[in-house]
Amino acid sequence: MVRQPMVGKSGSNMVDRKPLDLQRHLPSWPFVALASLLLGGVAGIVIYVGIYDIGADAPHWKPIGWLIEILRDRSIAVRAHGVAVPADLNDQKRISTGAGLYADMCTGCHLAPGMEKTEISQGLYPPAPELNRGLAHSPAEEFWIIKHGVKLTAMPAWGRTHSDELMWDMVAFVRKLPSLTPAQYETIVKSAPADHDTMMRDMPDMPIGGSGVSRDTERGQ
């Protein structure tokens, strides 16, 4: 007499199934350790012998450039999350003050409406964004970038020498900038309430001695 296999309610054969043995499908620890050592050794050799061209006139290899962009964008987004944004960024006085600061400090790299590329802007890598074309950053992210700068981009940390209030003035202007014609830009720059040095002296939370110590509007920073 031949025993028939047990059949479940669904009509399929009920076969004992063993749990998946992950150890059979994953590399062993010695293999992982050896592979890590080899990759680290190759990276060390590449760095030591200077294969990678660090010159500003030699663009990054595409995978490296892609990774750096992701690192930059995520780093800025995470750190800007705690920034408290003022409610008066559309205030005309803020915008005018920011225009004066922008004209003094930023046009050499970021240009302005109707302005030709400068020698500095042409020599930068990565190239500085032309801010009159707009940016995809939030006000909080723009403030963080202006205050802390960005490594290896020639973007300085203006927070070492400028107050939070002045940097928010710059944010207010930068957000207005893409909508300005060259003539409107010149007009608004001329309307700046004071020159750069006077604006800095008048700020109550001006960093002392360039130390960057100020009443920070960033929570937890």
Language-model regions, residue ranges each:
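N-terminal amphipathic/basic-hydrophobic helices that include classical n-h-c signal peptides
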Residues: 1-14
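Periplasmic c-type cytochrome electron-transfer domains
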Residues: 15-96, 100, 120, 137, ...
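Short hydrophobic/aromatic-rich motifs at helix boundaries and adjacent loops
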Residues: 78, 113-116, 143
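Short, flexible loop/turn segments with low-complexity composition
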Residues: 183-193
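Periplasmic/extracellular electron-transfer cofactor-ligation site
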Residues: 99-126, 151-157, 178-183
